[in-house]
């Protein structure tokens, strides 16, 4: 079992005039300039697992948090489940964010490889409110068959009810479920949490998202 590791990521503010189109392509120059959060961990991996790599980058402006995922995946497994469907049963990338670390509440955004979004608010431990939604958040997915899929999130601060400032620190978990035919599911995340069985919702083990201009 792997120990917890509270990582941190410096989230840079977009330069004035720079825009990001949410199309899942990640082809704006800014995505190349931003550094990644670093390697994702495989705390529950077993011999023979594929351990397909994941890259994530983030930035922000006055109104939104932007997240780009590049997920290597030789075989996409996902269904069209619609909005707020059971996307955790698919190839999916996720972000959990806690803008107010003094409480036990956070927000979840899960996007499967078909572009279906599940958003919710939650209270630790696993008290989910699926009635909550983020109508101003936008997402998109783009698939390169046999190689990878990419996902983009544009998360609305207005919907979260909190606007970060330079130096603000939020808790964050980045994670992924990867399913491949004939194999067991693989679960990877940015900050391991010490649990013996896969579980992404361990709020005290979330990393830190640090907003900088």
Label for each model-derived stretch:
Residues 1-213:
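Structural preference for beta-rich elements and adjacent junctions enriched in aromatics
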């Amino acid at each position: 079992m792997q120990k917890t590791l509270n990582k941190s990521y410096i989230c840079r503010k977009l330069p004035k005039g720079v825009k990001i189109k949410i199309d899942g392509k990640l082809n704006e120059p800014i995505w190349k300039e931003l550094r990644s959060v670093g390697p994702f961990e495989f705390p529950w991996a077993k011999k023979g697992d594929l351990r397909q790599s994941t890259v994530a980058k983030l930035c922000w402006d006055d109104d939104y948090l932007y997240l780009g995922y590049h997920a290597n995946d030789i075989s996409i497994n996902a269904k069209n489940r619609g909005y707020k469907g059971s996307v955790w049963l698919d190839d999916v990338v996720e972000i959990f964010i806690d803008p107010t670390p003094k409480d036990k509440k956070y927000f979840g955004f899960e996007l499967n490889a078909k572009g279906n979004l599940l958003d919710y608010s939650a209270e630790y431990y696993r008290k989910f409110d699926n009635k909550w939604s983020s109508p101003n958040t936008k997402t998109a997915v783009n698939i390169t068959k046999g190689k990878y899929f990419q996902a983009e999130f544009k998360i609305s601060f207005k919907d979260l009810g909190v606007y970060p400032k330079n130096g603000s620190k939020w808790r964050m978990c980045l994670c992924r479920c990867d399913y491949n035919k004939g194999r067991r599911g693989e679960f990877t995340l940015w900050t391991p949490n010490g649990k013996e069985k896969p579980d992404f919702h361990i709020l005290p083990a979330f990393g830190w998202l640090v907003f900088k201009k």
